[in-house]
Regions:
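Single-stranded RNA-binding regions, centering on S1/OB-family and related RNA-binding modules
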Residues: 1-284
């Protein structure tokens, strides 16, 4: 087992060819691409040691986001249901795998392409690199306390823990932690998913934020109105429902209350999108 892998080392350039310099360190040889800069035989070079997609020992002088000793963010590039997810952690010619063994049991909650995971690297007995997601304690140590003056603000939030009690997230732009109760979302977010979350409260006990994925009340009105417009457009521009219809009919058709329905109709009439009569509602 090569114990130098997934660490930063300093080695001696002992040979080269058209494409690579070859660096020696403790009896191991690592190839450094000449595209990363000009060097000379006999020179000492510092870089990150790893194995590429062909399992060949490589060295890179480029910045890497995660090592054995340091956590860093990786971006999901591919998902394989039989293996896990592949991450870009900044390594040339290398995507590091997060094994299915450490991913959620429900594959619907696995990260998708473009999602982000906070990981460190590990090496197995066959010199294969694996990425391991950070434990919740890592985020708790890393994050700063939230403030009690952020009500109704929207922030990007990355999902780092999934529990029955709710979704735990990290806010990268202000280095804070948040929690989303199941009642404040329409569906369960994926691990690593980047969300647009709104602050709805503050937990004094641990200085974290309570967040919601649901729209504000005025945004819900807009969404209801758009839903009604879409329904009218797909039904020939007319529906038998109007503001005199029963709450049961409205709920069965749109899944909203009569109060929400009437507000949405009022907004659409004010915008001159529809008209109502005793027969129903018509698109203008």
């Amino acid at each position: 087992m090569n114990t130098l892998l997934a660490t930063v080392i300093t080695g001696l350039i002992t040979d080269e060819n058209k494409d690579f310099y070859f660096i020696q360190k403790d009896g191991f040889t690592f190839a450094l691409s000449k595209s990363e800069g000009e060097h000379h035989i006999g020179e000492m070079v510092k870089g990150f040691a790893y194995t590429d997609m062909q399992q060949k020992a490589r060295l890179t002088t480029k910045e890497t986001f995660a090592t054995r000793d340091h956590y860093g963010w990786g971006t999901v590039t591919e998902v394989r249901k039989d293996l896990g997810v592949f991450l870009d952690t900044g390594l040339p010619d290398k995507q590091v795998v997060v094994s299915l063994d450490v991913l959620p049991e429900l594959k619907e909650l696995w990260p998708k392409k473009g999602d982000r995971l906070y990981v460190f690297l590990d090496v197995d007995k066959k010199d294969r690199l694996w990425a391991l997601p950070a434990d919740p304690e890592v985020f708790q140590r890393m994050a700063t306390p939230a403030y009690n003056n952020m009500q109704n603000q929207n922030w990007p939030a990355i999902v780092y823990r999934l529990k029955l009690s709710g979704t735990f997230v990290y806010l990268p732009e202000n280095n804070m932690l948040g929690f989303i109760h199941p009642s404040e979302r329409y569906s369960e977010p994926r691990l690593g998913q980047v969300l647009d979350a709104r602050v709805i409260g503050f937990r004094e006990v641990d200085r974290t934020l309570n967040l919601s994925l649901k729209p504000r009340s005025f945004e819900m009105l807009e969404n209801d109105a758009q839903m009604i417009l879409t329904y009218l457009e797909s039904n020939g521009g007319f529906m038998t429902l109007n503001d005199k219809s029963s709450p049961e009919e409205i709920k069965a058709t749109f899944g909203i209350s009569k109060g929400q329905f009437k507000k949405a109709l009022g907004g659409l009439m004010k915008a001159k999108k529809i008209k109502q009569d005793q027969l129903g509602t018509e698109l203008l």
